[in-house]
């Protein structure tokens, strides 16, 4: 090793030394240039000792030497690791320490030779310190470096310079790009302030004082921003913060970049607490109180990496699953097209067998009824005049009777809730699709109306008017001795006008029930906007009372049927109508008494939390929902909300997000009676009435509650493993599940026990859940306040780690993006020193950007082999196709089964 050091020093100082021993020749491989030049230059040399080969690139100046790059290379000369740009020095971890030790000796030799001529300059000392930092990088931190500080992300960078050049041509003015448009040009939309700071830094480094860029200058900027070397990216980031270019970051400069990063990521609370976080960074990186930090200090903090144990576990899981998936995929590729389509068909039946048999039965009944009535009228005398028009009209009428009766059953909420909670019928009937089935039946009604009314109005009546006297003779028992004089005679008759009115009312209700109108998605300029929305949907849907009344009349006054037992409309409708009316009466009596308000909180993101006393005899399951009516807002409207409390809690709670007129007015009414929170409380406004202060209670409006009602999420009890995914306010039913699991853990000391006595009087069932993964994705940092108490409770009481919480803030750019680099650093530092997350304010660490859902499923699959996992999602529909597909893929390609359930949100 002494020969290695001596050879290196000699190469750095003596250009003329060309004779070496054979041993030295084996150690020093010819370099790329003169290491002893008086001018500044970059030189490269390769060294070999035993089986290790390393290439070192030096930045040589008159009085200092700095390592530019350190790379491990193989015998053929190709590199298998780097040092300067953050890659591992050698691939095998066992060699890392030995090689690092040798490199340190080389560095020390260089410093000693340089100092023999002159005392070490501050620059040389900083270089040596930087070298030691780089040589100490672990393999995991090098991996972090590869991903870190990306100024141009893969989403933008994959398009390359061509895309940037195209945007330049679109945004340029007189051949130059304005400073204010720099961010948009390089793909940093929405981060204009951050992009301007980048512009200023790059321009300052090049001595550019103008506020515009030419295309060549922009390309130069772009090449620096897309440099793949971590140290170069670190220098770019450091220069952006170091505005006076003195090589040091003061507390004020650190504060500015914290505020800038917080603004770019829409994190207002971090921006407000910039002073506090600046002090935290300076305390960590400047322990001697020099008043500044240097680049190598910042680098050390940026390169913090996850624990090696976790990394090894993840790697093992990933490789294990990848092998299984590869084998499965390989077998799929060898399939013939016929076998492939057959397999896809079988997969479809496996996933949708409940829906399939119900839909098959429904369609079969409709077809059978149509054919039965069609054949019946095909053999009657009226067929001789009206032909296939009357058979079509009567066949469609029979399906209409059936569907008008059936369409009421999916909305009998109390009946469905009782059946799914008390019986095993839910094992074969897809109760979760009740609303979807209601819509399908409504579509069947629309088809039946079109065929029935269309055939009568356009074919049957005209044919009867133009029938010969001989043909009409057979119709006299039905239409009278005198032939109808005109078309109007049919329309103004009882059968005619009742049918026309029903068609008009159903058309109105059907149109305003469409999502586009029900959710009021019309533009403000559209004159129909005031006529749409939930209220329009709710009131027009209640026109069914008139429709069913007219249907009874229409089905009684028939032209071609005189005997009562042949008028079958009432037979179809009797039971469903009685059942539905009974439900409405039950709801009326059950929701008569108001609930007591115990606590109110108004949170960021326009969320109102209401904590109420339980109505007498009120029992529910986690995942269910209730209807709420506030008479101060509207005396008629009921709105559904998921229950966020657990069955074992002594209160009933809901979290309501403002989305329309009714919820906006409700929030306003309760906000007026609240106060600002005291220290230690969350929310914007609060009111705690649990101590029974009657004068304060009187200020709150009266609330009526109806429910509970069954929902897909209540089926979580069927699974040992849960994957709960909530998007925004969609986390509400899942929070109740998390609290219920926690209550079982707290009450019994472990899972696998029976459910609380208060939740049901039925026979107790074992509590199945052994593991729960909860992923909550939200755009706003303030959203974490909604359920801060629950997260703290889980952290404190779940000692066995049954519940795994993952919070994701999607407004923050993904880890590795330069815009979020400082936020990630702050989070790691805050969590390490204080155990508190900077966004949620709890011990639950927040992740940035959206989750990689494939990786999430991968983790669960390898952790729970040969088990059924219940995947429960509640949120906007945008994520449903992806999660459904992933559930199917991992079910088919691993030995873990994923059952996907979606809330009707």
UniProtKB/Swiss-Prot annotation:
Domain FAD-binding FR-type as annotated: residue spans: 587-715
Outcome (variant: residue 277 to Q): Reduced RAC1-binding
Region feature (EF-hand-like 1): 172-180
Keywords: Calcium, FAD, Flavoprotein, Membrane, Metal-binding, NADP, Oxidoreductase, Peroxidase, Repeat, Transmembrane, Transmembrane helix
Domain EF-hand: 229-264, 273-308
UniProt-annotated location(s): Membrane
Extracellular side: 377-440, 518-539, 587-717
Alphabetized InterPro entries for the sequence: Cyt_b245_heavy_chain, EF-hand-dom_pair, EF_Hand_1_Ca_BS, EF_hand_dom, FAD-bd_8, FAD-bd_FR_type, Fe3_Rdtase_TM_dom, Fe_red_NAD-bd_6
EF-hand-like 2: annotated segments: 206-217
Membrane disposition: Multi-pass membrane protein
Consequence of changing residue 253 to A: Impaired calcium binding
Region (Disordered): 1-46, 69-134
Compositionally biased region (Gly residues): 75-84
GO CC terms: plasma membrane
EC number: 1.11.1.-, 1.6.3.-
Domain Ferric oxidoreductase residue range list: 395-551
Topological domains, Cytoplasmic: 1-355, 462-496, 561-568, 739-905
Subunit structure comment from the entry: Monomer and homodimer, stabilized by swapping the EF-hand motifs. Interacts with GTP-bound RAC1.
Role according to the record: Calcium-dependent NADPH oxidase that generates superoxide.
Annotated family: Belongs to the RBOH (TC 5.B.1.3) family.
Name of the protein in its database record: Respiratory burst oxidase homolog protein B
Organism: Oryza sativa subsp. japonica (Rice)
Lineage: Eukaryota, Viridiplantae, Streptophyta, Embryophyta, Tracheophyta
Gene: RBOHB
């Amino acid at each position: 090793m002494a020969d290695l050091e001596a050879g290196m020093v000699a190469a750095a100082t003596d250009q003329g030394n060309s004779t070496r021993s054979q041993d030295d020749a084996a150690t020093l491989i010819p370099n790329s240039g003169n290491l002893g030049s008086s001018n500044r230059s970059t030189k490269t040399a390769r060294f070999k000792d035993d089986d290790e080969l390393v290439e070192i690139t030096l930045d040589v100046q008159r009085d200092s030497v700095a390592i530019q790059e350190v790379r491990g290379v193989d015998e053929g000369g190709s590199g298998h690791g780097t040092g300067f740009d953050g890659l591992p020095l050698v691939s095998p971890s066992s060699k890392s320490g030995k090689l690092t030790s040798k490199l340190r000796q080389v560095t020390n030799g260089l410093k000693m030779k340089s100092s023999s001529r002159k005392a070490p300059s501050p620059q040389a000392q900083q270089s040596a310190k930087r070298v030691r930092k780089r040589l100490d990088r672990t393999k995991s931190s090098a991996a972090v470096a590869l991903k870190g500080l990306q100024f141009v992300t893969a989403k933008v960078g994959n398009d390359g310079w061509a895309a940037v050049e195209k945007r330049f041509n679109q945004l340029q003015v007189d051949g130059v790009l304005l400073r204010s448009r720099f961010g948009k040009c390089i793909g940093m939309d929405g981060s204009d302030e951050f992009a301007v700071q980048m512009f200023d830094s790059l321009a300052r480094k090049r001595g550019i004082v103008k506020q515009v860029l030419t295309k060549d200058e922009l390309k130069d900027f772009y090449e620096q921003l897309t440099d793949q070397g971590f140290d170069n990216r670190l220098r770019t980031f450091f220069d952006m913060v170091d505005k006076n270019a003195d090589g040091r970051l003061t507390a004020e400069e650190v504060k500015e970049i914290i505020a800038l990063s917080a603004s770019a990521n829409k994190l207002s609370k971090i921006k407000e607490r910039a002073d506090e976080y600046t002090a935290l960074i300076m305390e960590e990186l400047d322990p001697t109180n020099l008043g500044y930090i240097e680049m190598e200090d910042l680098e050390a903090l940026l390169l913090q990496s996850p624990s090696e144990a976790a990394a090894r576990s993840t790697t093992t899981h990933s490789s294990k699953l990848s092998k299984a998936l590869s084998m499965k995929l390989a077998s799929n590729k060898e399939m013939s097209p016929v076998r492939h389509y057959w397999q896809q068909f079988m997969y479809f039946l496996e996933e949708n067998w409940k829906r399939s048999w119900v839909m098959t039965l429904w369609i079969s009944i409709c077809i059978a009824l149509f054919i039965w009535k069609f054949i019946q009228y095909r053999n009657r005398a009226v067929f001789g005049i009206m032909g296939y028009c009357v058979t079509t009209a009567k066949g469609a009428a029979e399906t209409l009777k059936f569907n008008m009766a059936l369409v009421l059953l999916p909305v009998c909420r109390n009946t469905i809730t009782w059946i799914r909670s008390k019986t095993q019928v839910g094992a074969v009937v897809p109760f979760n699709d009740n609303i979807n089935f209601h819509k399908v039946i409504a579509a069947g009604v629309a088809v039946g109306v079109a065929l029935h009314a269309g055939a009568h109005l356009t074919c049957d009546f005209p044919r009867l008017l133009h029938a010969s006297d001989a043909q009409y003779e057979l119709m006299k028992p039905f239409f009278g001795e005198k032939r109808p004089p005109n078309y109007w005679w049919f329309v103004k008759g009882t059968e005619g006008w009742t049918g026309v009115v029903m068609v008009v009312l159903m058309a109105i209700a059907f149109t305003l029930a469409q999502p586009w109108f029900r959710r009021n998605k019309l533009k403000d300029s559209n004159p129909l906007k005031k006529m749409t929305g939930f209220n329009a949907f709710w009131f027009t849907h209640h026109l069914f009372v008139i429709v069913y009344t007219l249907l009874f009349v229409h089905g009684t006054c028939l032209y071609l049927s005189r005997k009562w037992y042949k008028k079958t409309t009432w037979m179809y409708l009797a039971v469903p109508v009685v059942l539905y009316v009974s439900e409405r009466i039950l709801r009326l009596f059950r929701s008569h008494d108001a609930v007591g308000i115990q606590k109110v909180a108004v949170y960021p993101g326009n969320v109102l939390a209401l904590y109420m006393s339980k109505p007498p005899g009120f029992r529910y399951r986690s995942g269910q929902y209730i209807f709420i009516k506030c008479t101060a807002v509207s005396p008629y409207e009921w709105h559904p909300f998921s229950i966020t409390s657990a069955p074992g809690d002594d209160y009933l709670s809901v979290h309501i997000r403002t989305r329309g007129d009714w919820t906006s007015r409700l929030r306003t009414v309760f906000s007026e009676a609240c106060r600002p929170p005291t220290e230690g409380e969350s929310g914007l406004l609060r009111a705690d009435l649990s101590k029974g202060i009657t004068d304060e209670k009187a200020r709150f409006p009266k609330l009526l509650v109806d429910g509970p009602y069954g929902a897909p999420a209540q089926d979580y009890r069927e699974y040992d493993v849960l994957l709960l995914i909530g998007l925004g306010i969609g986390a509400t039913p899942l929070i109740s599940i998390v609290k219920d699991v926690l209550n079982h853990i707290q009450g019994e000391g472990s899972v696998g026990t029976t459910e609380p006595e208060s939740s049901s009087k039925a026979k107790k069932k074992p509590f199945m859940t052994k593991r729960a993964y909860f992923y909550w994705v939200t755009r706003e940092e303030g959203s974490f306040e909604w359920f801060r108490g629950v997260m703290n409770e889980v952290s404190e009481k779940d000692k066995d780690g049954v519940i795994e919480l993952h919070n994701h803030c999607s407004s923050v750019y993904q880890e590795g993006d330069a815009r979020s680099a400082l936020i990630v650093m702050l989070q790691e530092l805050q969590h390490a020193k204080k155990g508190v997350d900077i966004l949620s304010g709890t011990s639950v660490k927040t992740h940035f950007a959206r989750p990689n859902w494939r990786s999430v499923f991968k983790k669960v699959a390898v952790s729970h082999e040969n088990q059924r996992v219940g995947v429960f999602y509640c949120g906007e529909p945008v994520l449903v196709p992806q999660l459904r597909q992933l559930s199917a893929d991992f079910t088919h390609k691993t030995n873990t089964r994923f059952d996907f359930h979606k809330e009707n949100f």
